[in-house]
């Protein structure tokens, strides 16, 4: 059942029909040319994942559970020294990088634009992207690359302390029109809104060159801190808008099922993820819900990033909005079953078969 966007629709009354049903509704779903290439623009950060034995330790080190705090190099070192007894893993990260890696595993042609240092972390980061079949478009500068310390509570919630390093300092003229012309969709990380000239210029350039612009709001603190700027840029440039429940509430002041309707009036399609309840998608006078997949989360790190990958992959192959969201839900269901933002290599053949079933 489809619903008029101008009416309030309680979440309990939103239903997602079968994929077959939505295949018959392609005229509602913004079907686009197949085999679109997607490039991401985001903070290039090495993820250091720490599995906390108890969440009380967060207050001891002065970080609020669930927050994303910016830290300097000295704070980063102090936090990691305090948590030396916690199990840890390391992997190239940053929200958009996670999304581009997942897109490449699905078979999409994906690229990533970021800024790194001339250190070992930067070299490792670039090599890891190449191995994942993501085209790296890096701007290099002297000094240390950025990193994100991800502290995972026993209930799976993530708390982040981020040392950005050079990651957010990309200048507008460091992204050429020649690079952008090689792609059809650009996916921009909301965290980069701190660099207004970069985001504004890149969005304007992309639209002028005919690219679709996708934006992830990234964090409710980002929305609260840059709301006037977002209210200007989103209606003007953004086609596809991703947010979670708290980010949508920060932007609109509304609960999720109302927020998605309000957001859809500003963009081509709005997606609000709502955790274990799934996601809400609104576009072109319609609103519908997609069920969540996966069991009890071990770690929610990367759930939104992988959802975005699934959705954008669907769009790159001409799927409907609903099919795209179902692919996103599938990827989210897999990544919450592991520690870290990346799905294990061994799971991708199984995922690819599920994606084929959704599309067919």
Which role fits each region the language model picked out?
Residues 33-111:
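Glycine-rich phosphate/adenosyl-contacting loop at the front of the ribokinase-like
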Residues 207-212, 218-289:
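Conserved phosphate/ATP/ADP-binding segment of small-molecule kinases
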Residues 137-139, 150-193:
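Conserved phosphate-binding/catalytic loop of the ribokinase/pfkB sugar-kinase fold
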Residues 110, 136, 213-214, 270:
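Hydrophobic beta-strand scaffold residues
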Residues 75-147, 352-358:
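Substrate-binding N-lobe of the ribokinase-like
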Residues 32, 38-50, 58-65, 69-70, ...:
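Conserved phosphate-binding/catalytic region of the ribokinase-like
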Residues 1-9:
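Extreme N-terminal basic, low-complexity initiation segments
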